[in-house]
């Protein structure tokens, strides 16, 4: 696509993305999940599309990040937004550390073996998480209550996921335009 048309399309997506929760207030939660799925699709494209690795391990790193974020929110004593911000950073850091530790041995495996290894790790992580009492085991983690009205919660998370999807897409797009991409 030419840069002019590409820019117009990006602006249109941004305008629709910003206006959507106000125009369609009854489906804001579903739209937030749409941005989450777009975020997953963009990140999976790096592994599965560009690198050719059919990975089932993305959920493992996502889970590590989410649990780390939830633990910071639960245990830090910070306010809601500060804990969410710090927790998101901690979650990203924990997921990155797990990727650095698990990446080299896994990336040495090719084809079906890689897919099976990442699937096995994801299943093992789910079993560990469901038995580990500190992180809530099978019951999960009770998080702090959103400090505003319940109607604002869905909109807040919509814009948070919209921003994360946009930043992730822009980062991957910039990466693809380098020599590495």
Regions found by a protein language model. Name each.
Residues 1-181:
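Transmembrane alpha-helices and adjacent helix-loop boundaries
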């Amino acid at each position: 696509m030419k840069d002019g048309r590409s820019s117009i399309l990006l602006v249109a997506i941004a305008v629709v993305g910003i206006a959507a929760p106000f125009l369609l207030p009854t489906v804001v939660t579903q739209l937030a999940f749409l941005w989450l799925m777009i975020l997953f699709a963009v990140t999976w494209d790096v592994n599965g599309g560009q690198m050719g690795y059919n990975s089932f391990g993305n959920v493992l790193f996502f889970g590590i990040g989410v649990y780390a974020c939830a633990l910071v929110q639960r245990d830090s004593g910070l306010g809601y937004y500060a804990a969410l911000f710090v927790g998101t950073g901690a979650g990203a850091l924990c997921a990155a550390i797990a990727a650095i530790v698990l990446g080299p041995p896994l990336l040495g495996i090719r084809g079906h073996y890689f897919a099976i290894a990442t699937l096995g790790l994801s299943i093992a992580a789910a079993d560990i998480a469901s038995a580990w009492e500190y992180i809530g085991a099978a019951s999960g983690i009770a998080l702090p209550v959103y400090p505003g009205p319940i109607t604002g919660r869905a909109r807040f998370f919509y814009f948070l996921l919209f921003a994360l999807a946009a930043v992730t897409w822009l980062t991957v797009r910039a990466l693809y335009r380098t020599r590495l991409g």
